[in-house]
Amino acid sequence: MSLVSESHAEELVRGAGQLGIPLDDRQQRLLLAYLALLIKWNKAYNLTAVRDPDEMVSRHLLDSLSVVPFVAERGRNWLDVGSGGGMPGVPLAIMFPERAFTLLDSNGKKTRFLTQVKLELKLANLEVVHARVEQFQPSTAFDGITSRAFSSLEDFASWTRHLGNAETRWLAMKGVQPDDELQRLPEDFRLDACHVLKVPGCQGQRHLLILRRTS
């Protein structure tokens, strides 16, 4: 029996349309193939607390796709920190095959899963790194750095400071707007923008906070 049903495909296409993000055949096929791998591996690897496959389209795929317009603005070299099961990094790599995405996680089980995703989906623009973020030392700064349910804004900024520069945008996906966390931002970071995300099928508040370095 297929792990991904026709209703999952319909929900994905419908939800992406509501987000204003039409999917071509390749994008739809790869997103559903990724969903099937996530469902399969989650049983043994505990990649996500969402156990019900019927919830994964909205809570993982559509939630990840909600930041596509902001990634589309600019930046060819992206880092997804604490990528876990690959959200939002894998869906973004599928949507932007001409851009490079590095998925970073310190959990070996999760990076093994992400490596399998890269191989099976043939995502040449995806790199998987098994390391702690503080110890990751790439040769060049990233244009954009994403996180989803990773840490506080203070830690996100502090731990990834060395991975960006004054041109880098830090995109933090959050639930309710974290006003208390914003008060504790490092002095060399500022809030550039805050966007309310409307994710089809997701209850509760969703926000995207875009941070920039001030120096």
Curated annotation (Swiss-Prot):
It catalyses: guanosine(527) in 16S rRNA + S-adenosyl-L-methionine = N(7)-methylguanosine(527) in 16S rRNA + S-adenosyl-L-homocysteine. It is an enzyme of class 2 (transferase). One of its GO terms (molecular function) is rRNA (guanine-N7-)-methyltransferase activity. Keywords: Cytoplasm, Methyltransferase, rRNA processing, S-adenosyl-L-methionine, Transferase. It is found in: Cytoplasm. Its EC number is 2.1.1.170. S-adenosyl-L-methionine binds at G82, M87, V133, E134, R148. The keyword DNA-binding does not apply. It comes from the Bacteria. HAMAP family: 16SrRNA_methyltr_G. Belongs to the methyltransferase superfamily. RNA methyltransferase RsmG family. Specifically methylates the N7 position of guanine in position 527 of 16S rRNA. This is Ribosomal RNA small subunit methyltransferase G. The gene is rsmG.
